[in-house]
């Protein structure tokens, strides 16, 4: 099945309406009828605002979390609209993907 992999990037401690942003994203996706999604924590990374590493105590809560969904492109667009309508400004990637099951 040809779908897209929608990856949304958030800071691990960021919140939206009192809920961790990655939890809010998973809940919003479930409300749209998306049947599955995952949030992955990172060990280290860097971006335009510098390097982040789990070993730096003072950076606690600033490591990225990737929230990932494999859905049809139209569903990904619906979720991105929900995110925008909620006033969240988040970085995302939408990549072509193929889902299958091994025998």
Predicted segments, located by residue:
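Positively charged, small/polar-rich N-terminal and surface patches that mediate targeting and assembly
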Residues: 1-103
């Amino acid at each position: 099945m040809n779908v897209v992999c929608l990856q949304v990037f958030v800071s691990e401690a960021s919140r939206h309406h009192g809920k961790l942003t990655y939890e809010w994203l998973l809940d919003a996706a479930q409300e749209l009828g998306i049947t599955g999604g995952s949030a992955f924590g990172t060990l280290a990374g860097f971006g335009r605002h510098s390097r982040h590493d789990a070993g730096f105590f003072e950076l606690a809560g600033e490591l990225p979390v990737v929230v990932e969904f494999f859905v049809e492109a139209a569903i990904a667009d619906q979720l991105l609209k929900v995110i925008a309508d909620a006033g969240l400004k988040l970085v995302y990637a939408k990549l072509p993907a193929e889902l299958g099951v091994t025998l």
